[in-house]
Amino acid sequence: MDMYCIRGGGDGTDILAEEMAREYGMQIEVIVPPNHPRAKFTSPASVEVLIQADPAIGAAAHKLCKRVPTHFYTLSLLQRNYHIARKAHTVFAFGKLCADKKRVEGGTGWTVQLAIDQGKEVFLFDTNTNQWYRSENTYNIENSCLKKVTSFKPWGTLRLPTLHQSSAVVGSRDITPATRAAIKNLFQRTFCLPENIEQVRLELEGLHL
């Protein structure tokens, strides 16, 4: 199964996602700025590539009612987050959903907003309620203009989400036992569904194993 996981080289959610991706044989792409501790072990993104994110970060800051960081390292992490979202088909986030159901708290919220602004689908495991949510767009007429509004809706009774061909997994450094279990279950149900097991079996037969 040709799938790969994109992550940002941090602790907590990032580390566990990388461990699970390796366990299931996924390709892994780690995106870090040049001054990140992980840059010693993987090729960092160049400054020229990172700064391409600056206009998007400014737009996200406006929607999040936040200021763009002025500290170089903090800004470089947001630039990294933009490129994580850009390269992913779908983003799986583990964080705290705000009361307005439109934003996610902390650094994870920046990545989620950057993904939404790029039209990416986002699945959120809300660590407040330990429930899955999905991003959903609605369109309103405001001042004679069509305006898109994205909010998070409860997953409901549908089969829980599974990883896609190109998935980014993002979240907090500090993860609870419930969040840890949710991350592990995400990978497990992706690769243990009957249709996925059958695909792996056929690929192994093709290799005469």
Stretches found by the model and what they are:
Residues 1-206:
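Acidic/glycine-enriched connector segments
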